[in-house]
Amino acid sequence: MRQAETARKTNETNISLTLEIDGEGKADIQTDVPFMTHMLDLFTKHGHFNLTVDAKGDTDVDDHHTTEDIGIVLGQMFKEALGDKKGIKRYGSSFVPMDETLAQVVVDLSNRPHLEMRAAFPSQKVGTFDTELVHEFLWKFALEARINLHVIVHYGTNTHHMIEAIFKAMARALDEATTIDPRVKGIPSTKGML
């Protein structure tokens, strides 16, 4: 079973997280950042993962540390749960529309972390959430999961819709990339390792 769990406590945040890659879309997300709670909930649903997150942080300062640290811990657990990556498809991509918005996410579970993001959010905030934290979360997730992550919002005018479409597309792309393909024998790389 491809799953991992951890607890991470710093002077800024306290996070417990359990991830099951081959799940049913079951989420139990409790964070001090309501918008991230919403994004993680739909990420779980659309990726068919099972995810439990309990995250508390110094949100009296701002949402940065909590959002960043959730990305770090989720990335670490994603990498751990994938194990040796034998038999996976490795690559995944998804287009997701949300009303006027169209987002595209492409991933390679390559062990070469990179984030390429093309998204111009028209608003700096969604509610109280700073939209610049989306990049921070995605970069930390990609870095710790050691994946190549490309995010493109082709168009859109509503910042909430744009971010939501990104998280849904990322979930669907990761679901595809982590799928076990019976045609893949061993590691999906000519190098013999990822």
Curated annotation (Swiss-Prot):
Its main location: cytoplasm. Pathway: Amino-acid biosynthesis; L-histidine biosynthesis; L-histidine from 5-phospho-alpha-D-ribose 1-diphosphate: step 6/9. InterPro entries: IGPD_sf, ImidazoleglycerolP_deHydtase, ImidazoleglycerP_deHydtase_CS, Ribosomal_Su5_D2-typ_SF. SUPFAM superfamilies: Ribosomal protein S5 domain 2-like (SSF54211). It is found in: Cytoplasm. One of its GO terms (biological process) is L-histidine biosynthetic process. Keywords: Amino-acid biosynthesis, Cytoplasm, Histidine biosynthesis, Lyase. Its EC number is 4.2.1.19. It catalyses: D-erythro-1-(imidazol-4-yl)glycerol 3-phosphate = 3-(imidazol-4-yl)-2-oxopropyl phosphate + H2O. One of its GO terms (cellular component) is cytoplasm. The keyword Lipoprotein does not apply. CDD domains: IGPD. One of its GO terms (molecular function) is imidazoleglycerol-phosphate dehydratase activity. HAMAP family: HisB. NCBIfam families: PRK00951.1-2 (NF002107), PRK00951.2-1 (NF002111), PRK00951.2-4 (NF002114), PRK00951.2-5 (NF002115). Belongs to the imidazoleglycerol-phosphate dehydratase family. This is Imidazoleglycerol-phosphate dehydratase.
